[in-house]
Amino acid sequence: MLIPFILTLITTSLGSLLVLLLFWTAWRHRNPPADVDAPPPVIKASGPTATNLWIRGLRIGFLILLVAVFGFHSYWVFKADSTDEFTRSKRLDARNRRLAESGLKGWVLDRSGKLENALIRYRNDAGTISREYPLGEAAVHLTGYSDFVFGAGGFEYAFRQWLTEPESSLNRATSSGLVGKDLKVSIDSKLQREAFELLVRAGKPAAAIVLLLPNNEVLAMASSPSFDPRNVTDESTWRRMSQQADTAQDLSPLVNRALGTLVSGGPAFYYRPGSTFKTFTAAAAIDAGVSGEIFTCRAEGFTPPGSGRSIRDYGGEVHGSIGLADAFKHSCNQYFAQLGLKVGRLRLADYAKRLHFSVSPDDQASNSIELWQLEHADPRSFSSIFAAPQQKMNLSSAASPYDIALQSIGQGFDDVSVIQMALIASAVGSSDGAYVAPTFELGGKRKIISQFISAQSAAQVRGLMRLVVQSGTASGAFASLDRRLTAGGKTGTADREVTSYDRDGNPIVFTDSDGRQHTKRIGVTDSWFIGFAPANNPRIAYAVMVENGGQGAHSAAPIAVKLIERAAALGYFEDATQADRSRRN
């Protein structure tokens, strides 16, 4: 901000000086009297020609200066919104404050459209109008915040163009000034609150997503830990949280763990999907026609060719000779490691690409904004907030059989976000097996990104996932599910290495025998569960992840049960129930 100001000041000063110089040179080099007795060269140097040369030089210099000033100002016009220095300096300018107070942005309503369920609204308290977020920390990773000093995040930033267009009907009762357009989103405020409260009760960092099929409308997207959007106005609190996001990102409430992004924009980190990724491997195998294999699983584990390293089952279980259905139901690592090798690197890469995975270090990162269905959001603004990091596998020619086998069970080089796993559950839960873009907006067309697997293959995968909750690894957790409800799913237990922190949230650093410092790393076991409900005619797909929550059946699956029951209570299964009755009749 200082450089453009200085250049503008210099331009103004030099412009004034230029005018004075023009007058001075014109007077100094005015035509001499006709009777001056001097050689022609002297008369020429003292006349109009010299004046023209002076003016030409000054014009060129002034033009260069103007181009420089224009360039700097143009830079700030296009880069202002993404520059923290510019955003924070707005607070010092009274003109910006008056401009902001002259009009209001639109309200953001949940899918019901009811005022009492608004996600973002205004409040008129004795003539003082303030923007508030009724769900608070339960939805701040969605709603975001809006502040003079620290900018905006979430919906406030992603839909800012829509929210500032002057058509709000709700704000007219609050203010006579210019008002923005209202926005109704796909979120169900009641389900959103329920999801967040379930994560908080888990007592560990966690995330959950619920999608409404077939259009993948986001019903709930919760992340914990969280923060109250009102804290954004407290500069010391916000700076402390921002600093933590830089130094201890694993602990930061600013991270939207459902997406793997920061609420203010930008990527954060990935997760390993664990055994939930066997859903992908099973789907690829079924669709590729190699699902009838019987593999032997031994006490010593399965050693991929040329690796010398074995892959064993959780807790040392030995399943013996086993087929796909039982292997999926009991989450047999050895079976799926062998199945992944049977499907083969190239075919796995093909199916992974259908889900927009990067499968090689040489792959160019795809534009993750393509994974969303947008109508009212500005793509660039939306992408900076809600576009999850590129999902990754390593299925390049350099990948060893061990690498391929390990990735087939959701470990190794598999890098995913929670929403990616929800989308996989959606793809196999949909009747046509399509990979569909999620959306926060209502009334849009279903955006099919790719045909992941055939409808017949999807039906077979759903059958496998139904077994998991009936008599497999999730049967204990789903024993408490309302008997009128059915579901399908897959548990996951994922090993991951993270930074170790002290009680104050600082990374623990140690010094090795050579005097070099290292950040201490520890292993954690994340708990996962993905799936759909009802089982016969899915209406929702979901994914739940609890960091360091242990086995998927112990932490994530019970949360999924509660989400299914809440979704049913809110009426999202009524169409599916009627369809089931029609088929039986």
Q: Which stretches of residues belong to each language-model region?
A:
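Beta-lactam-recognizing serine transpeptidase/beta-lactamase-like catalytic domain environment
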Residues: 214, 218-275, 280-548, 552, ...
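Periplasmic/cell-envelope proteins involved in peptidoglycan metabolism and beta-lactam response
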Residues: 1-248, 253, 257-275, 290-293, ...
